[in-house]
């Protein structure tokens, strides 16, 4: 029996000795998911999915329910930390070429889409002013689909406008989708351990492995403790840091907010949507802003897996990160110059990464062959 099997038999998962802190975000995401399900359950006990009572029920949770304000704020801040962790997790995957493990990457992209849908449904539930108008604008994008659009929108709304049936089904979906996320996360982890984790060098780490426990369990615990500390610091000192002030007013279908925007973690996609002055084009760009991640495994051309030794690709990667932040920032601003042109330029840069990366991989291969 090989040493690897002996380690597995001893309940010690063999892991590459050189995986860095960037590999800790998976366990942090799992912690976030558990936190969201636990706090969400306690919130659901007291929440009322009715357009006349939803806003009041959220106020009731924060004011009257014992420790309700902690549950509500943990759930809201936890969602933001969840997305911070998942964006870092995806960026790590792009940088170190982890997308070459196709099954893991594609299951992860599916997880991201379901997570975004879950967060969107959750944002609508308090039935505040921004909740209502963000839901109206985003669901209305379905009407851009030729032939089927209007029928699909009416079906999703449960009527001819956003109303009580919409809120009820959004609550049902927001409750059930996290369980889908749990099952998909299990598949994601099983598929990962089918091949094993990669490492920063992008090389095979079979020759140099150490037991997962105690080395990586302590390393994971450190990052989880830091994340929990950040969560409780925000909760204690600035619980409304990541909330929209507009959402503290009850939804009013007769008054449109001056500037409609979703939560900060959707602003990159919303910024891309707004940068195109055409409804169908904008909707396609919005969908592609996430779906384009699925192309990464099929367009990789470099002989080197990781970007660690590819300076040209590193420049393009960090441009993508800067672009992501820029689009997020411009999406918080009104639709007026210079923000329109900044948003359009940033959107072009965002999509160009997925075109430039394979071209640079091919160029780097040529340079290496010349040096040989």
UniProtKB/Swiss-Prot annotation:
Molecular functions per Gene Ontology: metal ion binding; ubiquinol-cytochrome-c reductase activity
Q: Which cofactor does it need?
A: heme b
Q: How is the cofactor bound?
A: Binds 2 heme b groups non-covalently.
Residues binding a ubiquinone, per UniProt: 193
Q: Which controlled-vocabulary keywords does the entry list?
A: Electron transport, Heme, Iron, Membrane, Metal-binding, Mitochondrion, Mitochondrion inner membrane, Respiratory chain, Transmembrane, Transmembrane helix, Transport, Ubiquinone
Supply one GO BP term. Answer: mitochondrial electron transport, ubiquinol to cytochrome c
Which residues of the sequence carry a binding annotation for heme b b562?
A: 75, 174
- Which topology term describes how it sits in the membrane? Multi-pass membrane protein
Q: Which domain of life is it from?
A: Eukaryota
What are the transmembrane regions?
25-45, 69-90, 105-125, 170-190, 218-238, 280-300, 312-332, 339-358
Q: Does the keyword Transport apply?
A: yes
What binding partners and quaternary form does the record give?
A: The cytochrome bc1 complex contains 3 respiratory subunits (MT-CYB, CYC1 and UQCRFS1), 2 core proteins (UQCRC1 and UQCRC2) and probably 6 low-molecular weight proteins.
Function of this protein?
Component of the ubiquinol-cytochrome c reductase complex (complex III or cytochrome b-c1 complex) that is part of the mitochondrial respiratory chain. The b-c1 complex mediates electron transfer from ubiquinol to cytochrome c. Contributes to the generation of a proton gradient across the mitochondrial membrane that is then used for ATP synthesis.
Query: Anything else the record notes?
Result: Heme 1 (or BL or b562) is low-potential and absorbs at about 562 nm, and heme 2 (or BH or b566) is high-potential and absorbs at about 566 nm.
- Protein's name according to its UniProt entry: Cytochrome b
Q: Give the source species.
A: Walterinnesia aegyptia
